[in-house]
Amino acid sequence: EARNRRIPVIRRAEMLGELMRMKYTLSIAGTHGKTTTTSIVGAIWEEAGLDPTIIVGGVVKGKGSGAKVGKGDYLIAESDEFDRSFLSMMPSSAIITNIDADHLDTYENIEDIKDAFVQFANKIPFYGQVIVCLDDPNVQQILARLKKPVITYGFTRQAKYRVDNLRFEKGFPVFEILNDGESLGEFKLQIPGRHNVLNATAAVALAIEEGISADIARKACAEFE
């Protein structure tokens, strides 16, 4: 219908790429966990009073839709590797949650997928950083090819932001995050699963690197559901 009426039709990623030119963009990529991680990042930025614009592929938790338009300088966007669309985006900083053999109708094999994530990460400007999960074997294999500042997180001992002392209270995670061995304190989630501990840790790492306090991140994580 739009084409019949001569209204331009463009892909989601291309539109996001244009929006990113006008904002300081935080881009969340990875095979799994993108929507949740994007939503937690958004919750932290809102708790910090930064009124971000948030765009996810699913529904923004607590918003009832796939987008929330804010008046602040930040755009927080889920970035999908499907059909290589995330290569149209211009992130200021990014998270890569994991890399898995998915969308093999678009990619030849896992090596092709890893190549795309390297291209994505290397689009980040010199003043940004890419936050990556050191627990993921495929992420580990691309680290040497990343030319931009890399910040690691995970349960792995070598991670800059390391999860420690994980336990579950009434089925929900309670854990400590260490930044270069120094404790940021205890964090609690209202969403279950070890995978969500990693998603939250990625969001906290990005927040700290962008100058948001651990206390603000802690409060946002505790209230996120």
Predicted regions and their residues:
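Phosphate-binding loop of NTP-binding sites
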Residues: 1-134, 138-149, 201, 210
